[in-house]
Design a protein with these regions (language model features):
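A structural signal for long alpha-helical coiled-coils and helix-turn connectors
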Residues: 25-26, 72, 180
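Intrinsic disorder in cytosolic terminal tails and internal cytosolic loops
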Residues: 240-288
């Protein structure tokens, strides 16, 4: 929008979608492995991913962090145009620049995140990033209440959006790693689908709420409400996601015969192996 009008922008986006679809069709994908589940009912197949997700402590923590991220992203996506066009009286190009600040922060974080994750555990990175979202939203709520509309406010908004973009990317990007380590290969499609569905529930909560508050109350109220939701998600994630989160967990199977294939393959060298929820591990070890 800084160089072309929105008609050409949407046309270019449509061409991009078509090109993406053609590229997807050109790729040969490996045949997916069949699920090992003994229960083949429609209900079991439909809910398997969500059941695995909600029984895995680190993924319950991920869902809480996703709620915090949704609170921040909803404020940006829904209210940027309202703030820039209505409150500040600026142009479509200025809206694009404001959104670009958020996008630049997200991309910058994505570039440096792999090196960070090589040194710092996912949990610490994601929860710290969620805490930055809380601080950023709270600071913008306070600034919105004391700084009048004008260029100063816009410059502050650009910086705030960049910070939110960085923190959003760092809180959400590692989710694929968590999902991959939390399921067997045959259950990963269902688990990724569960993440898609549950994350959209978070957005379904925050998007309408932030729009109603921004339009019906004030932007300060919208910022404050999203900060409160992000704080709730961050604290919930801290509670649900154990600080000690090893891949391999010691456990036994008193219900299985001694010659069971799982015992021979996974427990031959000891009582621990990478632990995920499946038909042989229906509850998390140590769950109260």
């Amino acid at each position: 929008l800084t160089v072309i009008n929105f008609h050409w922008l949407f046309s270019g986006t449509a061409v991009g979608f078509i090109a993406s679809a053609l590229l997807v069709l050109s790729v040969t994908l490996p045949r997916p492995e069949r699920s090992s589940s003994r229960d083949t009912s429609i209900y079991a197949k439909t809910t398997r991913g969500i059941r695995i997700y909600l029984k895995t402590p680190r993924l319950r923590g991920l869902l809480a962090v996703t709620l915090a991220a949704a609170a921040a992203s909803s404020m940006v996506i829904v209210n940027t145009v309202v703030i820039v066009r209505d409150r500040l009286g600026m142009t479509q190009q200025d809206v694009a620049l404001t959104l670009a600040a958020y996008g630049f922060g997200s991309m910058a974080a994505a570039f440096i995140l792999p090196r960070i994750l090589d040194r710092i555990p996912d949990r610490r990175v994601m929860l710290l990033s969620a805490a930055i979202l809380v601080a950023g939203l709270a600071a913008l709520a306070w600034i919105s209440s004391i700084v009048p509309a004008g260029m100063t406010y816009w410059y502050v908004l650009l910086g705030g959006w960049a910070v939110l973009g960085i923190a959003y990317s760092m809180s959400i990007t590692p989710s694929g790693r968590l999902l991959k380590r939390s399921a067997n290969a045959q259950d990963r499609p269902a688990l990724f689908a569960a993440q898609f569905a549950l994350s959209h529930i978070c957005w379904l909560i925050t998007y309408p709420l932030v729009g109603q508050l921004g339009a019906g109350v004030s932007m300060t109220a919208a910022f404050a409400a999203m900060a409160a939701i992000a704080l709730f998600g961050t604290l919930l994630g801290l509670l649900l996601w154990p600080a000690s989160d090893p891949d391999a967990i010691a456990h036994d199977h008193p219900d299985l015969p001694a010659d069971h294939e799982h015992l021979r393959r996974q427990h031959a060298g000891g009582a621990s192996h990478p632990y995920v929820i499946d038909d042989l591990h229906e509850r998390w070890v140590g769950k109260p």
